[in-house]
Structure formats: C-alpha cells, structure tokens
Amino acid sequence: MDKRWSLQGMTALVTGAASGIGYAIVEELAGFGARIHVCDISETLLNQSLREWEKKGFQVSGSVCDVTSRPEREKLMQTVSSLFDGKLNILVNNVGVLRAKPTTEYVADDFTFHISTNLEAAYHFCQLSHPLLKTSGYGSIVFLSSVSGVVSITDCGSLYGLTKGALNQLARNLACEWAKDGIRANAVAPNVVKTAQSQFFLQDVSKKEGLFSRTPLGRSGEPNEVASLVVFLCLPAASYITGQTICIDGGLTVYGFSSQPQA
C-alpha cells in the first residue's frame, strides 16, 4: 500500500470512543493499521467495545476516564505514554456533551458542564500530548466540533455552540503554534449524526423536518461518514492540511435559498 494512505506503525488516542462517532473513528483508524488507545466514562460500554475490536483483530486498548477530571486526564496520558513508548501520532478529541436550553435558562452548573467536558478537557489533552506528538515526528490533532460552532443552531443551545466555536479557534491557533514541532491540528464540524446522543433531536418530527429542509442532501449523517474524514486528516496524504474546520454537514452551512426540491 502507498504509505500516504496507511497508518501502519502509528499510534492514536481517541476520547469518548466506546460508542457513536468515537467508535466509528476507532474502527476506521484500525482499518488503516493504527494502534489505538481509547477512553470512555462507561466501563460497561468500554469493555463491550474492546471485546468487539479484539474479535476483529484490531490493536485497541482502553481506559475508563472521566475527562472532566484533571487527575484522570493526567493518569490517562501517563498510560498512553507508557503503552506507546513516549510517542503519539494522533490525538482525536471526540468527547462532547449537550444540554439544550434557551440561553436565559442556563445556570452555573450548565456552563461548567459544557466548558469542562467539551473545551477544557480537549485543551488539556492537547497540552499533555504535545511532548508525545512532537517526539513521534508526525503528529495530528483532530477536534470533533459541530456545525453549531460555525452557524447558529438554536435547538442545540448557545453553550454548546460556544464550546464548539472555541475548538475551531483552538485548531487554528495550534496549527500555527505547533507547526514547527511537526504537529498539525484540524477540526471536523458535523451536522446532526445518528447516534444515541442525537435521538432527542431526530425523534422530534418538527425539528428533524426543519433541519432536513435546510440540508441539501436531506438527511442526517452516519458515524462512519464523519470517521472517514477524521481519519483522512490523520493520514500522510493530508500532510499539507492544517488549521482548518471542515464541515461534514450535507450542505447545511452553505445553504442559502432555493425553490428546488431537496435530494
């Protein structure tokens, strides 16, 4: 295989990877030959996923981790450093949470919940992984952002959008600051994707129809459609792409007005 399209011999950490988009990312990374460590807050889901990956012959290990805890983040990175001999090629900051409310109804706990999970954890993981990424000689960071960080999606709430917009900016900053260390940073911004977390939205007929009417492809995304882009950004073939926020949204963010029927 052309080395540009292989992750053979490379190592990766994916957060929140026992289900949903994170699970799909692990499957895609493993398919390209990467060795992967994952973390998840649910021990039950994590163990189930690890068993499934073992049956498929994937090189995946895992740790239970509450990413909102600074000591647990530090412990996780110590584990990763030990497993991968002080080197890491890929960091995928996938963990994300959402409490959808009108802005006037958010309380202090909601603010802390979003910031600590969606933003602070990703920021700290980048700091902790920097020496490992630099030592590897080829580092790639991918943030799982959202179209909510690019355009206003009122139904997702302003706090969620705030944290995702911040991740997009963090990708730009790190791309410039850490390029000299051989590290690239990008963000992927999906539309609504079919996962357990999005069911509250997709089961509401009026919300779903409203979203699909503004999405040229007329549907929600699939986890593997997001995973394929994430993994592409980690491949040597994408070595000149950094600092970008790429929307994978069925055309939502470019939709203006059209009298033509959707797909």
UniProtKB/Swiss-Prot annotation:
Keyword Cell inner membrane: no
GO molecular function: oxidoreductase activity
UniProt binding sites for NADP(+): 13-37
Keywords for this protein: NADP, Oxidoreductase
EC nos: 1.1.1.-
Binding, substrate: S146
InterPro entries, per the entry: NAD(P)-bd_dom_sf (IPR036291), SDR_fam (IPR002347), TR (IPR045000)
Active site: Y160
Assigned protein family: Belongs to the short-chain dehydrogenases/reductases (SDR) family. SDR65C subfamily.
Name this protein carries in UniProt: Tropinone reductase homolog At2g29300
Species of provenance: Arabidopsis thaliana (Mouse-ear cress)
